[in-house]
């Protein structure tokens, strides 16, 4: 699935954004224990630390059995914002017209397992926050980036993170969780254009 939406403001960075998502896809972060390979998860974590140095320099990183929590201090510690999107994926199924793990970029589209569900949104979160930090932006409130490594199998990393936040008195003002793609053509069973925001 893809969208033809463009914003000229971001065109100069489009190659970087596509490269980021492509590299995300190349990491076979399959959480199903039958196909699980820890080295692929380690590769993903190593990449984001190199790719987004300011996020990790300015943020406090905690590992929850592969689950990612990064807290970036804002001017206020009250009413933080949480941005969420998981980075694990399911095994490739069915027939693919290309390698599901290639992260192939062609005609402005990045192909592969996880592009929509949901490495695309996670890449957007990291790229946006890194860009803001690079510009010297100061967040009004604390920001948490949270990403599950076990969402597809209903794992314990996010429940553990929720408990950690609760135990430390953190009460988010807003949680934006993955949502879905902005896709054109529409998903099966939906007439017209389609977008979903998870809040």
Residue ranges and their predicted role:
Residues 1-118, 135-139:
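Acidic/His- and Gly-rich active-site-bordering loop/insert found
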Residues 13, 55, 166-167, 199:
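General structural signal for secondary-structure boundaries
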Residues 110, 116-198:
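Acidic/histidine-rich catalytic neighborhood of metal-dependent amide-processing enzymes
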């Amino acid at each position: 699935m893809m969208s033809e939406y463009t914003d000229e403001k971001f065109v100069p960075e489009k190659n970087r954004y596509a490269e980021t998502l492509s590299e995300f896809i190349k990491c076979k972060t399959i959480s199903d224990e039958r196909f699980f390979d820890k080295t692929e998860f380690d590769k993903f974590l190593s990449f984001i630390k190199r790719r987004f140095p300011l996020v990790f320099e300015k943020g406090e990183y905690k590992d929850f059995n592969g689950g990612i929590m990064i807290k970036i201090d804002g001017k206020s510690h009250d009413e933080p914002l949480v941005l969420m999107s998981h980075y694990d994926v399911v095994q490739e199924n069915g027939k693919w017209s290309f390698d599901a793990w290639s992260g192939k970029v062609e005609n402005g589209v990045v192909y592969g397992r996880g592009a929509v569900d949901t490495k695309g949104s996670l890449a957007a979160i990291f790229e946006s926050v890194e860009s803001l930090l690079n510009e010297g932006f100061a967040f009004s409130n604390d920001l948490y980036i949270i990403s599950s490594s076990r969402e597809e199998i209903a794992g314990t990393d996010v429940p553990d993170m929720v408990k950690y936040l609760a135990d430390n008195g953190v009460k988010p003002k807003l949680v934006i969780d993955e949502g879905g793609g902005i896709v054109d053509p529409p998903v099966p069973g939906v007439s017209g254009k389609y977008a979903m925001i998870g809040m």
